[in-house]
Curated annotation (Swiss-Prot):
The keyword Cell membrane applies. Residues 916-930 have a biased composition (Low complexity). This is Protein translocase subunit SecA. It is an enzyme of class 7 (translocase). Residues 916-952 are annotated as: Disordered. The gene is secA. It catalyses: ATP + H2O + cellular proteinSide 1 = ADP + phosphate + cellular proteinSide 2. May bind 1 zinc ion per subunit. Its EC number is 7.4.2.8.
Length: 952
């Protein structure tokens, strides 16, 4: 059936061949589904669901019963300190859930041919698109939890409808993850009629603009019409966040899915949570998210106070330090290390500024200054305006190195963004305190079934397999690919290279071919634009500064003779159609004109792509090439390289320069041969291998905090679900009494016991009756003391409950547990961040930093658990409910009005790579009752001022 397997490899071909019988079966069903009425086609969904239900009742009922029993048993075990039993039950539950997934997939496989046939027919009737056979193959690969590599223009958006519909039949919700908000709306709206024809609901998650926004999402509903004139989304009905997640299929970005997960784990009430179980997700452009964005965790934080003075001091200091004299630059690892002369110079300058304490920068009290120094040097050497960021409206905005887009709202973390703001003399914003965080890697590893689509995944197949356990399957094209990829041309310097680029642009343009030129930075795109203007060559520029015009520029990029200069992969997700954007067929004049242009470009040779520099990743280069030659169209591509390009300067340019000098070539004569191309490719492979190791290391480090997060979030959810907190808290009290009694009554001689200390400590937990004092306890044995204090604690607990009522006591238990858990978890995250930064020093002691981090992290986590128990025990008797309306904790407020951040973490602490953070501060929600003053007593009853307690 499929003839285009050349170069795919035997295993990939076998994978495709194994799916061919299913394609044949779907094709055989086509005529019978075409004969169905619209109502009968929609009724197929109810039929499929009923068949799945019947299958589960016969094949999975025992597993479901076992899961329920094991879950109940685990909840009981968690009330005790039997860790071995808990571990055994968790392992059993994980195994049972895997067995259930196998049963579910088997049931879905049984109805796959009919379900795919139904989607194909619904698509043909509603949007006029019929799935090709290769698209059916792509849908099956996605359903099986693998990555489908499909070339540009092969219809990934349409392919996704097949597995999304099939897996939505389980009723657990499925997610389609896009690379930006526009595509989340466009794809949900475009495919909406297909799902609606099948009786399946589809929603799109919109970014929340304010914390009080009630309807930050949309549901496709043909019966609804927007009141906004010329609304491109006229059938998108506004709905709440919870309703969006209750839809059968939900489209959104990784950022929105991730922040909703974090926000749900900060909410004070389960009824406020929006997400369901993480069931099945298809990630569009999966390489962009799980490879390029892998080092970017999602963080919810709030401003932390730190004066901007130090940033300004170091912004003045950095230009006074000379590279090569005061510090050495390591471009490969992107860091700068001070020389001995540099240390002396810095100490002298800082003393003059009056910010250094003592006589040496090595003194412990000067440790924060070293971080400021590193950030200032990084801002000076590695973060250049119009390369890594732009300054717009007195604000530093990050540029996405992979797409060239402005990353509005994102900020570098760990003080780097502030250092750049100081360098650029714009307002320095406050640093942040982390309330909740999860890496992109761990977020998507939570899904029971994960898959993805992209045009370029094969080069990263090893990483997908090792980190995510995802197999890459290359899907054959619907038509043979005929694009011609020319060899690289290498020049001695940038000037000669860009002159040659301009000449080739002019040559192709004169042939009537559209030209797409990819640059690596805004600066290069604007420099090339100026060169083209001087030559009188009409062109469009697409970079972060013009991102608003992106859709329009991409739509016109395929016209005859059109020249488009774009940073990297700006416009990814939108096809460049030869002849320009295809107009509606009912517009005779416009459509006729488009056909002429389309044919003209085809005959001229199609779209020509020029890369002005090799990227560190072959995959990014392939993405640029992939803009040309879609759906069997003609096209070509060529890369131009200079010896002073970043990748050439960092890897292997000396060898190539030696070849050029040996050949006696001048600067305007290019070299083009296999040796140079292989050298370049080997350099890219080395960089890819380095970044793979970085990301693999990141997973290993983040898994430490991830295990902590799983435990804390599970405990938090149990509290919200109404777990028996009373027995848990009483157990904590008994344990505290036993521990303190044992500690204060050591030794056989009771005269040596510290009973005064014991009475003081227990009196700090609850008010002891007058008759229980050191003198009375001296007459008792250790066991009798423990028994007396425990009995007294239980009686006082019951007395408190009788005074305020059982319902109020349960509420008080929940408030104290949540407040304690949340506040201490925030502190623990800060401790782990600091530990991660410092642990790299273990390498100097010949210790593996990762092992040291795991060991230290375990100690810190045990301390966290003990501190939680301690604080709960010491607060439960002292705190009273004084008002009807529960006041939100600081953590709950962070959930409603987060400062959202994203930052790449170093793979290992020694790497010292400052990260990226995203900030989208919003206004606080209006209070339900009279606002509490900062100096008023806290309404939670702690006795502290509001600003020192819940108002932090």
């Amino acid at each position: 059936m499929f003839k285009f397997f050349s170069g795919f490899g035997d295993s990939n071909e076998k994978e495709i061949r194994a799916l061919e019988p299913l394609v044949d079966k779907i094709n055989q069903l086509e005529s019978s589904f075409s004969a169905l009425s619209d109502e009968a086609l929609k009724a197929k969904t109810a039929e499929f669901k009923e068949r799945l239900k019947e299958t589960f009742e016969t094949t999975a009922s025992a597993i479901l019963k076992d899961i329920a029993g094991t879950t109940a048993e685990l909840e009981e075990a968690q009330k005790t300190a039997d860790n071995s039993k808990q571990s055994r039950l968790k392992a059993k539950l994980e195994s049972l859930n895997k067995d259930l997934s196998v049963k579910e997939n088997a049931a879905l496989n049984a109805i796959l041919p009919e379900a795919f046939a139904a989607v194909r027919e619904a698509s043909r009737r509603t949007i006029g698109l019929r799935h090709y056979d290769v698209q059916l193959i792509g849908g099956m690969v996605l359903h099986h939890g693998k990555i489908a590599e499909m070339r540009t223009g092969e219809g990934k958006t349409l392919v996704a409808t097949l597995p999304l519909y099939l897996n939505s039949l389980l009723g657990k919700g499925v997610h389609l993850v896009t690379v930006n908000d526009y595509l989340a709306r466009r794809d949900a709206y475009w495919m909406g009629p297909v799902y609606h024809a099948l009786g399946v609901s589809v929603s799109s998650i919109y970014p929340m603009q304010t914390p009080t926004e009630e309807l930050p999402s949309r549901l496709f509903d043909p019966t609804y019409t927007s009141e906004t004139p010329n609304d491109p989304w006229m059938h998108f009905r506004p709905i709440s966040r919870q309703e969006a997640y209750k839809a059968d299929i939900t489209y959104g970005t990784s950022t929105e899915f991730g922040f909703d997960y974090l926000r749900d784990n900060l909410r004070p009430d389960l009824a406020q949570c929006v997400q369901r179980e993480m069931n099945y997700a298809i990630v569009d452009e999966i390489d962009n998210l799980l490879i390029d964005e892998a080092r970017t965790p999602l963080i919810i934080s709030a401003p932390d106070t730190e004066a901007g003075k130090l940033y300004e001091v170091f912004a003045r200091l950095a230009p006074r330090l000379a590279a090569g004299k005061d510090y050495e630059i390591n471009e490969k690892d992107r860091n700068a290390e001070l020389t001995e002369d540099g240390w002396a110079n810095v100490e002298k300058l800082l003393s003059r500024e009056g910010v250094m304490k003592g006589s040496s920068l090595y003194d412990p009290q000067n440790a924060p200054l070293i971080r400021h120094l590193r950030n200032a040097l990084s801002a000076k050497e590695f973060y250049k305006k119009d390369h890594q960021y732009v300054v717009k409206e007195n604000e530093v905005i990050i540029i996405d190195e992979f797409t060239g887009r402005m990353m509005l709202g994102r900020r570098y973390s760990e003080g780097l963004h502030q250092a750049i703001e100081a360098k650029e003399h714009v307002k320095i914003q406050q640093e942040s305190k982390t309330y909740a965080t999860v890496t992109i890697q761990n977020l998507f590893r939570m899904y029971r079934k994960l898959c993805g689509m992209t045009g370029t995944a094969a080069t990263e197949a090893e990483e997908f397999s090792k980190i995510y356990k995802l197999e890459v399957v290359i899907i054959p094209t619907n038509k043979p690919a005929i694009r011609e990829d020319y060899g690289d041309q290498i020049y001695k310097d940038q000037s000669a290279k860009f002159k040659a680029v301009v000449n080739e642009i002019n040559e192709m343009r004169n042939l009537g071919r559209p030209v797409l030129v990819g640059t690596v930075s805004i600066e290069n795109s604007e420099m090339l634009s100026n060169m083209l203007k001087r030559q009188g060559i009409e062109h469009k520029v697409l970079n972060a500064k013009q991102h608003e015009k992106e859709a329009q520029v991409v739509a016109e990029a395929g016209k005859p003779g059109a020249v488009t200069v774009a940073t990297n992969m700006a416009g990814r997700g939108v096809d460049i159609l030869l002849g320009g954007k295809e107009p509606p067929k009912d517009d005779d004049k416009a459509y006729s004109q488009w056909q002429v242009h389309h044919q003209q470009v085809l005959e001229a040779g199609g779209l020509h792509v020029i890369g002005t520099e090799r990227h560190e990743s072959r995959r990014i280069d392939n993405q640029l090439r992939g803009r040309s030659g879609r759906q069997g169209d003609p096209g070509s591509s060529r890369f131009y390289v200079a010896l002073d390009d970043d990748i050439m300067r960092r890897f292997g340019s000396e060898r190539i320069q030696g070849i050029m000098e040996w050949a006696g070539m001048d600067e305007n004569t290019p070299i083009e041969n296999g040796l140079v191309s292989r050298t370049l490719e080997n350099a890219q492979k080395r960089v890819e291998g380095y970044h793979f190791d970085v990301r693999k290391h990141l997973v290993e480090y983040d898994d430490v905090v991830n295990k902590h997060r799983e435990v804390i979030y599970a405990e938090r959810r149990k509290i919200l679900l109404g777990a028996d907190l009373k027995s848990n808290i009483l157990d904590m009290i008994r344990e505290e009494i036993m521990t303190q009694t044992a500690e204060h009554t050591q030794g056989y001689d009771s005269s040596e016991w510290n009973l005064e200390g014991l009475v003081t400590h227990i009196g700090g937990i609850f008010a002891l009756p007058a008759e229980i004092n050191a003198e009375a306890l001296a007459k008792l044995s250790q066991e009798e003391i423990t028994e007396l204090l425990t009995r007294t604690a239980e009686e006082l607990y019951q007395k408190k409950e009788a005074e305020i009522g059982a319902g109020s006591m349960r509420l008080l238990e929940r408030i104290i547990m949540l407040h304690t858990l949340d506040s201490l978890w925030v502190e623990h995250l800060t401790i782990m961040e600091n530990l991660r930064r410092e642990i790299g020093l273990q390498a100097f002691a010949q210790r593996d930093p990762l092992i040291a981090y795991k060991n230290e992290g375990h100690v810190r986590f045990q301390e966290l658990l003990e501190t939680i128990k301690h604080d709960v025990v010491h607060n439960i008797y002292r705190v009273n409910i004084q008002i009807q309306h529960q006041t939100e904790s600081a953590t709950a407020k962070a959930a409603s009005r987060p400062v959202q951040q994203q930052k790449p973490l170093p793979a290992a602490p020694a790497a010292a790579i400052p990260g990226v953070s995203a900030k989208a501060a919003t206004q606080p929600a209006a209070p339900a009752a009279k606002e509490v003053g900062r100096n008023d007593p806290c309404p939670c009853g702690s006795g502290k001022k509001y600003k020192k307690c819940c108002g932090k």
